[in-house]
A protein has these predicted regions:
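His/Met- and acidic-residue-enriched segments that coordinate or traffic transition-metal cofactors
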Residues: 1-148
Length: 148
């Protein structure tokens, strides 16, 4: 989901921060997704390729937007999504049952925290700081609820 939305933001975003964040999301999440696919494949697990209904709705809603409205909604959605991702990956890194998945979560968590911080900064800039992530500020970001 973050890859698809990141590509859309990089092309459709009107502000530089949205375009840069979107490109970072597409790049970082593509790498993480490929690594996760390799882990899953080595264990004989097939990961879902379809986006869940909630995220399909988010993609559809954003696809119908343009201009500043798109930028603001994308920023808000990415902050919310990355807040959830960081929580899920932290839980997996701390107490996951599978050592390979646990290691993947621990390795990916700092990247997601960077994305969370960047999403927070982007949201603050575009939406007047309505939400806080608790992360540190950096540059551009990346996310995908079931996958990084």
């Amino acid at each position: 989901m973050e890859v698809e939305l990141g590509r859309r933001a990089a092309q459709q975003g009107t502000s530089d921060v949205v375009k840069q964040f979107g490109q970072k999301m597409a790049d970082d999440h593509s790498k993480a997704n490929a690594e996760l696919m390799t882990i899953a494949s080595s264990k004989g697990i097939t990961l879902p390729t379809d986006v869940d209904a909630k995220h399909r709705a988010m993609i559809g809603r954003l696809a119908r937007m343009s201009g500043a409205a798109f930028d603001k909604a994308y920023a808000k959605d990415m902050l919310s999504d990355h807040n959830k991702d960081v929580s899920a990956f932290q839980k997996e890194a701390d107490s996951g049952a599978d050592p390979d998945v646990k290691a993947f979560a621990a390795k990916t968590l700092p990247i997601l925290k960077e994305h969370q911080s960047l999403a927070n900064d982007m949201n603050n800039t575009l939406n007047g700081g309505s939400k806080k992530s608790g992360g540190n500020s950096n540059k551009a970001g990346n996310s995908n609820s079931n996958q990084p």
